[in-house]
From Swiss-Prot:
GO molecular function: acyl-[acyl-carrier-protein]-UDP-N-acetylglucosamine O-acyltransferase activity
One Pfam family here: Hexapep
Described purpose of this protein according to its UniProt entry: Involved in the biosynthesis of lipid A, a phosphorylated glycolipid that anchors the lipopolysaccharide to the outer membrane of the cell.
InterPro entries reported in the protein's UniProt record: Acetyltransf_C (IPR029098), Acetyltransf_C_sf (IPR037157), Hexapep (IPR001451), Hexapep_transf_CS (IPR018357), Lipid_A_LpxA (IPR010137), Trimer_LpxA-like_sf (IPR011004)
UniProt main location, coarse: cytoplasm
Disulphide bridges, residue numbers: none
Keywords recorded for this protein, A-Z: Acyltransferase, Cytoplasm, Lipid A biosynthesis, Lipid biosynthesis, Lipid metabolism, Repeat, Transferase
Subcellular location: Cytoplasm
Top-rank lineage group of the source organism: Bacteria
Reaction it catalyzes: a (3R)-hydroxyacyl-[ACP] + UDP-N-acetyl-alpha-D-glucosamine = a UDP-3-O-[(3R)-3-hydroxyacyl]-N-acetyl-alpha-D-glucosamine + holo-[ACP]
Name recorded for this polypeptide: Acyl-[acyl-carrier-protein]--UDP-N-acetylglucosamine O-acyltransferase
Pathway: Glycolipid biosynthesis; lipid IV(A) biosynthesis; lipid IV(A) from (3R)-3-hydroxytetradecanoyl-[acyl-carrier-protein] and UDP-N-acetyl-alpha-D-glucosamine: step 1/6
Amino acid sequence: MTQIHPTALVDPKAELAADVTVGPFSIVGPNVRIGSGTSIGAHSTVEGHTTIGQGNNIGPYASVGGVPQDMKYRNEPTRLDIGDRNTIREFTTIHTGTVQDRGVTTIGSDNWIMAYVHIAHDCTVGNHTVFSSNAQIAGHVEVGDWAILGGMSGVHQFVRIGAHAMLGGASALVQDVPPFVIAASDKNGNKATPHGINVEGLRRRGFDAGQIAGLRQAYKLLYKSDLSFDEARNEIAALLAQADASAAEPLRAFLDFIAATQRGIVR
């Protein structure tokens, strides 16, 4: 049965599965739906039009579903959707969307979100990501599956971080990071710059030597040649056309991502 601490305040209109746990002094609002096996730690707030899936663990002092920090917001009924089996640690803040975008902030499943993380309005976070402590992403940011954000990193609004990419700790990111790429600060300051393909991460995820070699070639064309962006994109397209089926899949993801950039690619 649902375990609600006597000091918790759960609105009668909230929909909680039979085995949800709500800790001491926590607050659950009227438009909240929480799935089976999810636990809410002490002193946390879950509010807004928020849907949380199954098996999530929300730590103490988290604020989930708060109103967006956007001066254009006028109390529209925007949403936050969270998937399954996520860990959301203490003092994390996750806000609902705005009508200026899709009206929803989306968190996938199996994400590891550490302490003091901020996920702003209208963000889209995939599956199996890691947000190290104090990572902060501004509004409208997209984070792909298996991406890793280092501690105390900051991401500018509307930036995209591709699948399997990695952002180093204490880095400031203002442009898109292609899939499979490492971006981190360097000796010249905290602005994130490209640092190669995330080879170790790809090996751990089961990518083979041919796939990694193809991505390294694409990276060299984009970052280590004298080609313009359009010329590099065309050369990567030619590389994709010659690749076998296994190597082609990550190359296509890389090419499609850079072709769709609006803010430009991290340099």
